[in-house]
Amino acid sequence: MKIANFEVGNGKPFFLMSGPCVIESEQMAMDTAGYLAEVTKDLGINFVYKSSFDKANRSSINSFRGLGVDKGLEILAKVKKTYNVPVVTDVHEDTPFAEVAEVVDVMQTPAFLCRQTNFILDVCKQGKPVNIKKGQFLAPWDMQHVVAKAKSTGNEQIMVCERGVSFGYNNLVSDMRSLEIMKSTGCPVVFDATHSVQLPGGQGSSSGGQREFVPVLSKAAMAVGIDGLFMETHPKPAEALSDGPNSFPMYKIKEFLSLLKELDHLVKSQPKIEL
């Protein structure tokens, strides 16, 4: 399948979806998009800018949710035009899907909503590439049913994304077998490296996170031969308005991506061992 002007899957080099969790301001979006676009261009990595206009599943009613659909789409359109990069954003059950589809290159469905049949169908009917996040409660082999729903709309541009599985209260773990298992769906497989280290509700009224584990999990996912890496980043994670504890420090990302590119090339150049 294609995102904008590049191919994903089928052994192609990994692509990156990255940006701040939520659109905090137009200036923040432009600054982060510009920096990430420059870094990925220098490294030769295909890039999709990610940021959300609304975070509908925040832990607390008092948590910052975003700038709303109208302002958010206006900013994403400006990012896309200014830096000539594709963009991805989250959609929710009450999102005006057609309006979003006019702007973004990829629509992303939240993990909590992966079993909501009407929601999945309505999103996929827009005809855009869709990144479906696997629920924290779902076995990887059960994603075949979610994919079947999605593709029943005639949309074959479906990706599946691993973002960790619930492990007791306020904790997630990443089962790397999940990435290999989900390849059986026939869809490109994406690993969400930053939400996988989230501690849901771990700070009482907000989620915590262990960003120190993002590098090791990302490298492990590369060893499986993933098609895409999802990694939220922020210039000052401690000051982020959403998901700061698990966001990757933006100004450290170039060196890390360079390493991941080497790993990706090494793994995908090796023959698969059949057992």
Curated annotation (Swiss-Prot):
The entry's keywords: Cytoplasm, Lipopolysaccharide biosynthesis, Transferase
Name of this chain's protein: 2-dehydro-3-deoxyphosphooctonate aldolase
GO molecular function: 3-deoxy-8-phosphooctulonate synthase activity
Name of the gene this protein is made from: kdsA
UniProt xrefs under InterPro entries: Aldolase_TIM, DAHP1/KDSA, KDO8P_synthase
Catalytic reaction equation(s): D-arabinose 5-phosphate + phosphoenolpyruvate + H2O = 3-deoxy-alpha-D-manno-2-octulosonate-8-phosphate + phosphate
Protein's cellular compartments: Cytoplasm
Pathway this chain belongs to: Carbohydrate biosynthesis; 3-deoxy-D-manno-octulosonate biosynthesis; 3-deoxy-D-manno-octulosonate from D-ribulose 5-phosphate: step 2/3; Bacterial outer membrane biogenesis; lipopolysaccharide biosynthesis
Keyword Nucleus: no
GO CC field: cytoplasm
EC number, UniProt record: 2.5.1.55
Domain of life: Bacteria
Family affiliation: Belongs to the KdsA family.
Pfam family, one: DAHP_synth_1
Major subcellular site: cytoplasm
Biological process, per Gene Ontology: keto-3-deoxy-D-manno-octulosonic acid biosynthetic process
